[in-house]
Design a protein with these regions (language model features):
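Phosphate/nucleotide-binding beta-alpha loop and adjacent structural elements of enzyme active sites
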Residues: 1-168
């Protein structure tokens, strides 16, 4: 009820743009888990009640929405969140201040890749073929950007705290 009332009061542009007001502030997911396919549920079974740990989330997307690591962050874990979407780390800095939040692209070698951005940011990616297949009447590529990508080992060499082990 509150969500529908707010939707009537807040201009449409805030509901339809990537990183919109809705996704940032109102989309509180049911239950304690956040991932899209239950990855955090499976990981919680592996790590049990462990209240400290370290994760690396490549393609982190959002600190809560479809997040594989939000559940663990709320338990006291820390980690590195990596996402290529320009501007994506602003919301991570707000909701995940204990984490290392990096707006970077990951690739098998240092190279420039074309990043395909959709009106639904969960669909963003680097594959032209997959991006073209994902386009529908609802989901559209809104922009492309050439982004310098780095191997994960280079990113970890530069940003992983000295002596820090990675749980997942």
């Amino acid at each position: 009820m509150i969500k529908s009332l707010l939707k009537k009061l807040i201009p449409t542009k805030y509901w339809e743009t990537p990183g919109s007001f809705y996704h940032l502030y109102l989309n509180n997911h049911a239950g304690s888990y956040y991932s899209q396919e239950g990855e955090d549920i499976l990981l919680s079974r592996i790590f049990g009640e462990q209240t400290e740990g370290f994760y690396v989330d490549v393609g982190a997307h959002h600190p809560r929405r479809f997040s594989n690591t939000c559940f663990f962050y709320k338990r006291g874990w820390r980690g590195i969140n990596i996402d290529a979407l320009p501007g994506s780390m602003k919301v991570f800095q707000k909701f995940r201040p204990r984490d290392i939040n990096l707006e970077l692209a990951v690739s098998e070698r240092e190279q420039v890749l074309t990043y395909y951005m959709f009106n639904e940011p969960a669909l963003n990616g680097f594959s032209k073929t997959i991006s073209e297949k994902r386009q529908t009447d609802v989901y559209k590529i809104t922009n492309t950007k050439d982004i310098l990508a780095f191997p994960l080992y280079t990113i970890l060499d530069n940003h992983l705290p000295l002596g820090q082990s990675i749980d997942f």
